[in-house]
Amino acid sequence: NSQIGVPLSVWLLDQHTDVALFEAGISQTGEMQALRDIIQPTIGIITSIGQAHQENFRSIDEKCQEKLLLFHDAKTVVYNSDDNIVSRSMRKSGYNGQKIAWSKEDPKAALYINKVTTKEATTVVEYTFNSTVNATYHLPFIDEASVECSFACAATALHLGITPEQLDIRMSQLEPVAMRLEVKEGQKGCTIINDSYNSDVSSLDIALDFMSRRPD
């Protein structure tokens, strides 16, 4: 997702490529413009605006606005309309393309999350898409971060024409990322949650929340 990694990924594309998915990360102002020129995304997905690299920005609003530069020329942007910072930055950005919002609070959002139910190691999400499709999908995760990431994924997939049935099948087949909330059995009845892939205040909070949700 860096100034080096993104160009290397773009070079892997050829005439047989139908879809390419890039993560674009920044650590200071001015970096996103370079990534935008390289990626030139058709669809932009805003995941979360955390505390990583916050020391290089005057405010979290500034960082969010910097990230939104990536989507200036994108045809579609998918975002969480419940996030006040993201919603405010979207309005300030002057973006004129198609906006696809997901929300747990606004029934008028393109993807409205009606209900989220956690059962042991599984999460069931009930949703309405474009006020007409009512369906459900299952996730093999229970942590809040993974569940919320699935909302953006679902909104994008449904927008691209994936059926609710296909979405449910693929969501249920997702696998954990290595070193991200990995549960390992320790000695003498101890349980270890390995979240060493990356760590900041936000990810630590997610790990503690995940630990408190576990049935054991």
Task: Identify the residue ranges that each predicted region occupies.
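Active-site phosphate/pyrophosphate- and oxyanion-stabilizing loops and adjacent acidic/basic residues
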Residues: 8, 33, 68, 209
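Inter-motif core of Ras-like GTPase G domains
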Residues: 34-49, 216
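Short beta-strand-centered segment that lines the nucleotide-binding/catalytic pocket of NTP-utilizing
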Residues: 1-5, 24-25, 48-49
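Solvent-exposed polar/charged
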Residues: 37-38, 72, 91, 213
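Active-site beta-alpha connecting loops in nucleotide-dependent enzymes
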Residues: 177-179, 196-216
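Active-site phosphate/ATP/adenylate-binding loop shared across adenylate-forming ligases
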Residues: 1-16
